[in-house]
Regions:
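Non-ligating segments of multi-cofactor redox enzymes
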Residues: 1-210
Length: 210
């Protein structure tokens, strides 16, 4: 492998508009229930009732922010390691792909991935996931999600170059700790972002949103 392609996400700029989700779903003609890119809202804190004014509540450490997440095209992908038929491979540019001609639909990769990236297509009987828009990448074009982000909160490029430009943060809540799979991701944290594994908040997105 000569390089490692990666995504960049600016949590301080994301407005939770889900344009990236829609672009991904449209470009890949994904069925209902399958979203290769998901926007997850995370929040916490408390609203404390005013003891003297009924109906009045005061915020206490209230926060919320959104994460746009897809397959992380990890440097140590557990999905590939778990596949019993060798149906998941990394290209020379680090992009992780599922060979659906080999896939037997056992779903081991789904259970192994801490990001929930591989998703089972019930009708086709095989696993699916983000391809980094490899077809567009090979033409020198942007992934659909990156191109669709109106806030320019998404970017892509070689991992080393993204780290040099944006820093080396690669995990904030609610994402898992990065040392599990070494995700090819760089994040500019939201001002209220919490370190993975130490969060006091919870995912507040509705299931149908993800």
């Amino acid at each position: 492998m000569t390089k490692q392609m990666a995504f960049y996400f600016d949590a301080s700029a994301c407005t939770d508009c889900k344009a990236c989700m829609a672009a991904c779903k449209d470009k890949n003609d994904l069925p209902v229930g399958i979203n290769w890119r998901r926007v997850i809202k995370y929040g916490g804190g408390q609203w404390i009732p005013d003891p003297e004014n009924k109906g009045l509540w005061h915020p206490s450490n209230v926060f919320t922010y959104a994460i746009s997440a897809a397959c992380m095209h990890c440097q140590s992908p557990l999905c590939a390691a778990s596949c019993p038929v060798g149906g998941i491979t990394k290209r020379e540019d680090g992009v992780v792909l599922i060979n659906q001609d080999k896939c037997i639909g056992c779903r081991y990769c789904e259970w192994a991935c801490p990001y929930g990236a591989p998703q089972f297509d019930e009708e086709a009987g095989v696993m699916t996931k983000c391809t980094f828009c490899a077809d567009l990448l090979d033409k020198g074009q942007k992934p659909a999600c990156v191109d669709a982000c109106v806030m320019r909160a998404l970017d892509f490029g070689e991992l080393d170059e993204l780290r040099a430009k944006y820093g080396d943060v690669d995990a904030i809540e609610p994402l898992p700790k990065a040392n599990i799979t070494e995700p090819s991701l760089v994040i500019t944290p939201h001002r209220d972002a919490q370190v993975s594994g130490t969060g006091t908040g919870r995912i507040i997105s509705m299931p149908e949103e993800m």
